[in-house]
Amino acid sequence: MWIEETDNGKFKFRENYKDPYTGTWKPVSVTMEKDNSRAYKAARKILEQKITEKIAQLKASELLFTELLDEWWTFYKKELKRSSVASLRGNIEEIRETFGIGVKVVNIDPKYVQNYLDNLDCSRNKKERNKSMLNLAFDYAVGLDIIQDNPARRAKLPRVKKTLEDWKKAEEKYLEEDEIKPLLKELYRRPSTYRLGLLAEFISLNGCRIGEAVSIEPCNYESKSRILQLHGTFDHTEGYRNGEKTAPKTLASYRETIMTSRELEILQELEFMNELEKNTNHRYRDMGYLFTTKNGVPIQTNSFNLALKKANERLEDPITKKLTSHIFRHTLISRLAENNVPLKSIMERVGHADAKTTAQIYTHVTKKMKSSVADIMENY
């Protein structure tokens, strides 16, 4: 650092710094009233701050989007559960390979993001997820003062126009009473799927997610009060044998429900069955959960869904809807809606924080409600 006296009697403190990208030396300066040790110390501090800011600005202006994405993803992963990281990893890889390759972050504008979204050849859900990831990555950049505005949040996805096919799909998300009864009966008919029948019936009565159901432990329910604690979900990222119970994704999912007498019977029956296996089956591994295979490992979602499909194929009148664990959860929502239970109460029961998810099913009236309207008009 050196000092130059100005024409007006003040003192200009100067310093040079090296541009990390060009290798050239560039000047910074600050003018002080006096030339003494106190002014010297103050000037040095100011110049160091200026140099730090200028280098940061240079680095920000040169930062490539792929570098930003990697930096943000490393940070964001720390907030996520292992299952969420595994679920999102594919989206992150796709964005890295298709968006902003070799492009500086500061050069990406809303139009650039819009063109990317418009040209994505994938499902609506995948587009929404990719846009959500871009929103978060650019939010991170705004927070670090790399950019002033988030271009992804200004880009838009077109509103989805509902078609007759969409309405038909929505109505196929749940089972009617004349559909669920024969399906459960078929699951209970075979010893190999009996436990799966208990799981299917339990979800249809409680409305919990399959991950929540298979993470239920004996200590999570109380017989006298019939209170069930749903305080977690089963994370099988490392495989079901190495899985563990983890906290739910949202606060709304952390809940307690009052069980029906049938729900209580199912849990008690499972406790009895597991205790029997523990004492007679040398392959049984006690992992502490209720909804397990006969060997003690929590029931796998894929195996459960496959068993549903095969059981349905054996029915005299197979169900034409896509059968997964979620259809039983949705069935409870439709039943409660059919009985005029308020939307808020249904949301609390099934652990939904967003009314949209429940409302999609809530608004699709079941056959019973449709027929009751017809009966009223018939007698009008």
Predicted regions located by residue number:
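Basic, Lys/Arg- and aromatic-enriched nucleic-acid-binding interface segment
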Residues: 124, 128, 143, 147, ...
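DNA/chromatin major-groove-contacting recognition/catalytic segments
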Residues: 239-245, 339, 360-380
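Short, polar N-cap/turn motifs at the start of nucleic acid-interacting alpha helices
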Residues: 221-227, 341-361
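N-terminal DNA-binding module of tyrosine recombinases/phage integrases
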Residues: 7-12, 17-107, 111, 275-284
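Conserved tyrosine-mediated DNA breakage-rejoining catalytic core shared by Y-recombinases
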Residues: 14, 215-275
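Short, basic (Lys/Arg/His-rich) helix/loop patches that form interaction surfaces
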Residues: 187-196, 257, 273-282, 286-289, ...
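Short amphipathic helical patch at the helix-1/turn junction of helix-turn-helix
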Residues: 132, 203-204, 337-338
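N-terminal core-binding DNA-recognition domain of tyrosine site-specific recombinases/integrases
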Residues: 35-36, 74-146, 191-194, 298-303, ...
